[in-house]
Regions:
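Active-site residues of response regulator receiver
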Residues: 56-57
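Short amphipathic alpha-helix used as the core "switch/output" element in two-component signaling
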Residues: 65-76
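Short beta-to-alpha connector loops in regulatory alpha/beta signaling domains
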Residues: 30-36
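Hydrophobic C-terminal alpha-helix "anchor/cap" residues
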Residues: 23-24, 71
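Acidic catalytic/metal-coordinating carboxylates
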Residues: 37, 63-66
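Conserved acidic segment of CheY-like receiver
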Residues: 3-14, 19, 23, 53
Length: 76
């Protein structure tokens, strides 16, 4: 079975790192990107198949729900 590809998006680096450490314990998960930048996340999704996005909904300067809609529209 191919590992699930995951993006972690949170503005706090320590939160991103903590989530990644937890996910790395599972060999069926590959973290493709850790970022606090919505543009970087969208670029990654455009260029790579991603199975799951872990997204902080309280992002400074970014409407997380609008970002979710953009992500959904990329996959249509």
């Amino acid at each position: 079975m191919k590992p699930a590809s995951v993006i972690i998006m949170d503005e706090h680096p320590i939160v991103r790192m903590s989530i990644e450490v937890l996910l790395q314990k599972n060999k069926n998960i590959t973290v493709k990107l850790k970022s606090g930048d919505s543009h970087e996340v969208l670029d990654c999704i455009r260029n790579h198949p991603i199975d799951l996005v872990i997204l902080d909904i309280e992002l400074t300067g970014t409407d997380a729900f609008a970002l979710l809609k953009r992500i959904k529209n990329l996959n249509k």
